[in-house]
Amino acid sequence: MTDRQGLLTDRIALITGASSGIGAAQRGLFAREGAAVVVTARREERLAGLVDELRAQGARAAYVVADVTRSEDAVRAVEFTVERFGRLDAAFNKRRHGAGRTPLHLMDDPVYDDIMDTNVRGVFNCLRPEIAAMLASGAGGSIVNTSSTGGLVATPVAAPYVVSKHAVLGLTKGPAAEYGAHGIRVNAIAPGTTRSEMVADWFAQNPDAEELLHRATPQPRTAEPQEIAEAAAWLCSERASFVTGSTLVVDGGFTIL
């Protein structure tokens, strides 16, 4: 038998929000599956350490510091990827910001604006240069946006977070329809409760939340970032070659009840 070829062998991937949580798990998995990866986030020290770790394992990896809520930063991240590796084949857009459980009628405008800028504008800013790069290469590509179960049902978080994650699904279906004929696939993942810095903070502020969520989930536990990363890697691979405009729910069954 020959060695198994990685899902993403010889592909060039850009991963945003890669300094922690799902994004950090993603860069490791993509590299192990054979991709050259460019990781981006706001924390340079964390990114540099992640890239050093990947290179020590024999992966092709680079990083660029960027805040994708700024359109020029998103453009720069894509341009860096193309300059460094020659093209862009796959992109994983992951930015997430919530606001605890602040009641809607008590929420200030800046909180709403911050959530929408991070969760929606950040995806929009990434999609434009990513799609442009894939069109320029003529080889198509695959983009995966990160929504959440909050994009499917009303979850026990602030209303603007639910709104923003529904919007991400629109930013998935629209481009999927518009660019499918160009060989560009756009899908979304909708993770359930997943261990990350943000979720850990939320659990700390709401001590009973994790147990309550487990009771409402057929698989009564919190997902590990690696489990979410596996779903996104499949969507970015040619094994999902006829999948576009879809949302892959990775929530242990939370939304089926």
UniProtKB/Swiss-Prot annotation:
Annotated GO MF terms: oxidoreductase activity
Induction trigger: Constitutively expressed.
SUPFAM superfamilies reported for this sequence: NAD(P)-binding Rossmann-fold domains
Keyword NADP: yes
Phenotypic consequence of gene deletion: Deletion mutant cannot produce VB or virginiamycin.
Positions annotated as active site in the UniProt record: Y161
pH dependence: Optimum pH is 7.5.
Top EC class, one word: oxidoreductase
InterPro entries associated with the record: NAD(P)-bd_dom_sf, Sc_DH/Rdtase_CS, SDR_fam
Keyword NADP attributed: yes
Highest taxon of the lineage: Bacteria
Keyword line: NADP, Oxidoreductase
Catalyses which reaction(s): a (3R,4R)-3-[(1S)-1-hydroxyalkyl]-4-(hydroxymethyl)oxolan-2-one + NADP(+) = a (3R,4R)-3-alkanoyl-4-(hydroxymethyl)oxolan-2-one + NADPH + H(+)
E.C. code: 1.1.1.413
Notes on temperature effects: Optimum temperature is 25 degrees Celsius.
Family: Belongs to the short-chain dehydrogenases/reductases (SDR) family.
Its job: Involved in the biosynthesis of virginiae butanolide (VB), which regulates the production of antibiotic virginiamycin. Catalyzes the reduction of 6-dehydro-VB-A to VB-A, the last catalytic step in VB biosynthesis. In vitro, can use various synthetic A-factor-type analogs.
Assembly and binders: Homodimer.
Protein name according to UniProt: A-factor type gamma-butyrolactone 1'-reductase (1S-forming)
Organism: Streptomyces virginiae
Lineage: Bacteria, Bacillati, Actinomycetota, Actinomycetes, Kitasatosporales
Gene designation per UniProt: barS1
